[in-house]
């Protein structure tokens, strides 16, 4: 009986590893050809019960390796920029800019999948390709391997090989959804777009690495 249990566990483990490898390969295949990504987005945060807690719109730009620009519009205006080494977070309402080192935890932020190293997906996430939810849509469910992750699960959805949404859940059961429109892939983006010029008269907070 113990042998049968051990064999069952081994078989399930092997099947899980094969599913993860297949998911990683499929997801990497979709992401590896994306050198730049520009889009408008709508971000909605919901409570565990489904109540809308926050909704913002904005634009993002991403360029490999490691360059990212994110700006939300009023009334919750904020700009986040990284050059791959440090991050600038600008809150106009507070007249404040926070500058911090791009730590491993921050580099695992979901949106940074668009500018990070595709080859590291397998190191950072367990990846499972989901059954087709609707014709032409491909979904992947990612679970972070790190214990200090900012989220528990992340779903990436593609239509016609193009990323259309991200949905993540945290440990409190809250869900944040990102839906992309006006997507442009592999268009030229100057690296100047990923360096933040600090406005005059704002407070600057530099966090230690």
Swiss-Prot record:
GO terms for cellular component: outer membrane-bounded periplasmic space. Its main location: periplasm. SUPFAM superfamilies: Prokaryotic lipoproteins and lipoprotein localization factors. PANTHER family: OUTER-MEMBRANE LIPOPROTEIN CARRIER PROTEIN (PTHR35869:SF1). This is Outer-membrane lipoprotein carrier protein. HAMAP family: LolA. GO terms for biological process: lipoprotein localization to outer membrane; lipoprotein transport. Keywords: Chaperone, Periplasm, Protein transport, Signal, Transport. The keyword Chaperone applies. The lineage of its organism: Bacteria, Pseudomonadati, Pseudomonadota, Gammaproteobacteria, Oceanospirillales. Belongs to the LolA family. Participates in the translocation of lipoproteins from the inner membrane to the outer membrane. Only forms a complex with a lipoprotein if the residue after the N-terminal Cys is not an aspartate (The Asp acts as a targeting signal to indicate that the lipoprotein should stay in the inner membrane). Residues 1-21 form the signal peptide. Monomer. InterPro entries: LolA/LolB/LppX, OM_lipoprot_carrier_LolA-like, OM_lipoprot_carrier_LolA_Pbac. Pfam families: LolA. The gene is lolA. It is found in: Periplasm.
């Amino acid at each position: 009986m113990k042998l049968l249990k051990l064999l069952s566990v081994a078989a399930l483990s092997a099947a899980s590893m094969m599913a993860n490898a297949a998911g990683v390969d499929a997801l990497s295949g979709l992401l590896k050809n994306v050198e730049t990504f520009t889009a408008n987005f709508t971000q909605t945060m919901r409570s565990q019960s489904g109540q809308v807690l926050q909704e913002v719109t904005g634009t993002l730009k991403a360029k490999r390796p490691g360059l990212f620009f994110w700006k939300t519009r009023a009334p919750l205006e904020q700009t986040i920029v990284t050059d791959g080494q440090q991050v600038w977070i600008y809150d106009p309402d507070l007249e404040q800019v926070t500058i911090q080192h791009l730590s491993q935890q921050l580099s695992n932020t979901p949106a940074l999948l668009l500018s990070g190293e595709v080859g590291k997906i397998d190191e950072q996430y367990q990846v499972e390709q989901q059954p087709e939810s609707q014709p032409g849509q491909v979904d992947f469910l990612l679970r972070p391997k790190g214990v200090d992750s900012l989220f528990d699960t992340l779903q990436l959805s593609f239509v016609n090989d193009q990323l259309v949404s991200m949905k993540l859940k945290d440990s409190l059961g809250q869900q944040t959804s990102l839906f992309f429109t006006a997507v442009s892939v592999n268009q030229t983006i100057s690296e100047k777009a990923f360096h933040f010029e600090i406005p005059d008269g704002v407070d600057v907070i530099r966090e230690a690495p």
